[in-house]
């Protein structure tokens, strides 16, 4: 599940660093609509671009990815690897190395990062602020409730309010690194549960490492 730490996921009334900041009710209304629109889809297919930049270190990388989500099940293709999960286990498929790693998802861990809660990671742990708006595109700034516990300063969401969808997520790191997810396509998907079941016969020449 570490891949989703890239792929970054009520409000405190008394904070030290942000003691004078309160969440914007208007921002919460918009985010609630995004959550409702996402929950209304039985399955979702997302095509995205991930960008990592750090001008101080002269770093500029980008990768394309695809993610299909159905409840807690998902299929991911990103950064030269694939992942598959049935909601209880996750298979990481390293095609170049002909290796497959199997890990168990800790369902009792409230902080476990899964695709279903990744799309709504902003619901807890943040203060919300409205920023610029151009047409239907609204920027909402997320400030962490506990800044000392995270390695970033803030997250900016770009939301298309006409369809209640996130179009862009940008994280500003404390080390001057910026991580950005650009959503190129976000649409309902029709997919059977069988698509999320790992079939060992499809990978006869692969080494399987069971970490459960």
Show which residues each predicted segment covers.
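An acidic-aromatic
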Residues: 64-112, 179
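N-terminal leader/targeting segments and the immediate start of mature chains
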Residues: 15-59, 72-73, 202, 207-212
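Beta-turn initiation residues at beta-strand->coil junctions
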Residues: 52, 81, 94-95, 170-173
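Flexible, surface-exposed loop/linker segments and immediately adjacent secondary-structure boundaries
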Residues: 105-135
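Gly/Pro-enriched, hydrophobic low-complexity segments
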Residues: 126, 135-212
């Amino acid at each position: 599940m570490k891949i989703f730490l890239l792929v970054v996921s009520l409000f405190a009334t008394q904070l030290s660093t942000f003691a004078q900041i309160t969440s914007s009710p208007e921002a919460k209304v918009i985010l609630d609509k995004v959550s409702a629109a996402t929950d209304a889809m039985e399955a979702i297919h997302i095509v995205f671009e991930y960008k990592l930049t750090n001008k101080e270190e002269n770093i500029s990388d980008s990768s394309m990815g695809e993610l299909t989500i159905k409840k807690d099940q998902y299929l991911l293709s990103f950064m030269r690897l694939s992942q598959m999960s049935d909601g209880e286990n996750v298979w990481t498929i390293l095609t170049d190395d002909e290796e497959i790693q199997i890990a168990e998802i800790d369902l009792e861990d409230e902080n476990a990062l899964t695709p279903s809660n990744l799309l709504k990671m902003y619901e807890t742990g943040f203060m919300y602020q409205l920023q610029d708006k151009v047409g239907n595109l609204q920027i909402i700034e997320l400030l962490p409730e506990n800044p000392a516990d995270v390695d970033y300063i803030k997250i900016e969401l770009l939301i298309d309010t006409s369809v209640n969808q996130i179009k862009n997520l940008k994280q500003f790191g404390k080390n001057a690194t910026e991580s950005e997810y650009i959503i190129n396509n976000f649409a309902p998907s029709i997919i059977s549960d069988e698509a999320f079941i790992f079939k060992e016969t499809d990978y006869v020449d692969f080494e399987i490492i069971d970490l459960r």
